[in-house]
């Protein structure tokens, strides 16, 4: 995932439990290890995907295997990542098996979303504007099985959840004030959807 200035890229490595940072050499197009080349995660966390705050110096990594999100302070000049917080993506009472998949920050920079495969939900978090840390808003069922991916369309009005094992893409309206998701009733059949791209 490139940072908003397209200077650095963060690469989560699930197998090594680490987040690697590279700098883009614009003269050659090559990726070069950043000054702080990697940050270790907790053993067994399984970092999967990263997302940057659009305007503030924060990055968020969703950890697949322990169903958490790590909040980082991000140094846009050197590409450094400093861990600030780890928060679960699952409700306290949930005891089943679940892994995470996708993460996204709203275009407003006010909310973070993460998908849970097993709990089959989207976890919703509010971002503290002063510190970047997350607080849980709630969870919304994806109305399907195994939400491998989701995407927020460019205006930030709608979120689309791709349920891989129920062959559906479900549309939600994003409440701009609370970050909560409201099902629109629109469900599209699609064979094992695993990604959504807006062009």
Task: Describe each PLM feature range.
Residues 1-25:
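Intrinsically disordered, low-complexity linker/loop segments enriched in Gly/Pro
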Residues 1-8, 41-58, 89-109, 143-158, ...:
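Beta-rich, blade/repeat-based domains predominating
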Residues 31-39, 81-89, 133-141, 181-189:
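Beta-propeller fold detector
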Residues 164-173, 177, 182-199:
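Blade-level signature of beta-propeller repeat domains, shared across WD40, Kelch, NHL, RCC1
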Residues 3, 11-14, 53, 61-64, ...:
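Conserved beta-strand positions in repeat-built beta-propeller and related beta-rich domains
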């Amino acid at each position: 995932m490139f940072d908003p200035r397209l200077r650095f890229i963060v690469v989560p490595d699930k197998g090594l439990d680490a987040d690697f940072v590279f700098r883009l050499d614009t003269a050659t197009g090559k990726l070069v290890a950043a000054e702080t080349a990697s940050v270790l995660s907790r053993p067994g966390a399984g970092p999967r995907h990263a997302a940057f705050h659009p305007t503030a110096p924060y990055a968020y990594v969703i950890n697949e295997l322990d169903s958490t999100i790590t909040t980082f302070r991000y140094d846009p000049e050197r590409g450094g990542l400093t861990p600030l917080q780890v928060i679960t993506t699952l409700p306290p009472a949930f005891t089943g098996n679940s892994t995470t998949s996708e993460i996204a920050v709203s275009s407003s920079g006010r909310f973070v979303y993460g998908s849970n495969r097993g709990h089959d939900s989207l976890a919703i978090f509010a971002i503290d504007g002063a510190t970047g840390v997350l607080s849980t808003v709630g969870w919304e069922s994806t109305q399907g099985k195994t939400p491998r991916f989701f995407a927020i369309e460019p205006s930030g009005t709608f979120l689309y959840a791709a349920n891989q094992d129920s062959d559906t893409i479900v549309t939600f309206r994003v409440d701009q004030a609370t970050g909560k998701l409201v099902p629109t009733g629109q469900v599209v059949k699609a064979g094992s959807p695993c990604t959504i791209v807006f062009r």
